[in-house]
């Protein structure tokens, strides 16, 4: 039997504290540095490819951390190997600021998954040690930008499902020493992953 600690969701959030040094970027400068990103993520950060993430409107601090993690290899994305090697930290901060300043477009939702997805997102499944997603990502999926917790609302369901699966099998491991996302995702079955990803895609920031 899984024993649940008090304030479990709050503790999970605290474990996700962002470690990267971040001083903020300049969106105007960032716009001049994203040309090589446009093919996969769109000129305004709204990728039309469901397997590639939308970056528009994402929290600046979170974006910087992900860019830095990709650059150092802490987050492994085969298609991005070497693409960020010539950028310094200020360049990455500027790119993050540019995408954060853009407006996200709406995503496609598979209605058949919405009810289960809503239940998992809002309430989790405490019998299996799955907390709700709202503690860190908010009731409407807007995240917590100052703390570095990502906005999920409106993201492509396909991309979200792949990331949850990657966390569950350990292919993605840049969630900090607390292993919060890995611990949660490995408790979810494939239907729950697909459902919560579809529900999140339909949320509006």
Where do the model's predicted regions map?
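Sequence context surrounding c-type heme c attachment/ligation sites in exported
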Residues: 28-35, 56-60, 64, 122-134, ...
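The canonical Cys-X-X-Cys-His
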Residues: 37-44, 95, 130-139, 196
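The feature marks the first
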Residues: 25-27, 31-73
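Axial heme c-ligation environment in periplasmic c-type cytochrome domains
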Residues: 48-54, 69-112, 146-151, 169-203
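Bacterial N-terminal signal peptides that target proteins for export
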Residues: 1-10
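Short, solvent-exposed interaction modules
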Residues: 108-149, 157
């Amino acid at each position: 039997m899984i024993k649940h600690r008090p304030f479990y969701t709050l503790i999970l959030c605290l474990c996700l504290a962002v470690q990267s040094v971040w001083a903020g970027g300049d969106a105007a400068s960032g716009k001049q540095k994203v040309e090589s990103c446009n093919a996969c993520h769109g000129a305004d950060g709204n990728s039309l490819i469901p397997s590639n993430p939308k970056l528009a409107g994402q929290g600046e601090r979170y974006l910087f951390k992900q860019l830095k993690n990709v650059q150092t290899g802490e987050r492994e994305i085969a298609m991005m190997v070497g693409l960020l090697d010539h950028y310094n930290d200020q360049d990455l901060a500027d790119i993050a600021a540019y995408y954060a300043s853009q407006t996200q477009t709406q995503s496609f939702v598979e209605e058949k998954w919405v009810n289960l997805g809503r239940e998992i997102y809002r309430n989790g499944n405490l019998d299996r040690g799955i907390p709700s997603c709202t503690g860190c990502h908010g009731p409407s999926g807007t995240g917590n930008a100052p703390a570095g917790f990502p906005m999920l609302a409106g993201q492509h369901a396909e991309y979200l499902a792949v990331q949850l699966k990657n966390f569950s099998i350990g292919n993605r491991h840049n969630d900090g020493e607390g292993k919060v996302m890995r611990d949660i995702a490995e408790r979810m079955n494939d239907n729950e992953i697909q459902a919560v990803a579809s529900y999140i895609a339909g949320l509006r920031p």
